């Protein structure tokens, strides 16, 4: 949709250095059908800021171009095009534009309702969540209510979205027990993942594989959240771990994440 704006920003090294390109694609690990142009976060952030201020000419379909005069009009255009026509970077920038809008909380949440179902990759999801600084100042009760359907979703990255937002903006003594309650009631086997489990690193990048049982990116998000909670609220976290119904593999991932972090490598995990 805005690929004509993004393509000139791609690093020549991404286009010419096979090892560099494969390294980038392995980190992003987009699904095979999702095109990745090769832009990095700072470039996408700068592009989003420019579009938010000045708008952009967008391509809604082949030969059907439209001039959008501001970020909101570009967001509305993103909402109308088929999801599978968008590249990885376009989806990331769509999310950044939502974060940059000057609007009310209900208006922003309405935009998010159309955006969250498009998330199909950990990098898109986590990049959006880290960039959503407005959530730190939003009405927490309204925002928490908005997250509830995503905690209960059967789609991998809708659930991951709720978990990462909770970790980033609800990591307090007040909210942590509510988050733990959600973890205990997650029906992990019924969460669908488009990634298939494959041991070891695939020979080629972007093969639609993950190095753990489905839904791998939900399991990893829970482990990441728990390891982060251990750093801030060790007693609360250990009490939850001792009584949780989470699968054993998720607990092992949590322990591994805790041991990898300099903040918790010497902290008791159980």
Regions picked out by a protein language model, each given a short descriptive name:
Residues 1-270:
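Alpha-helical scaffold domains
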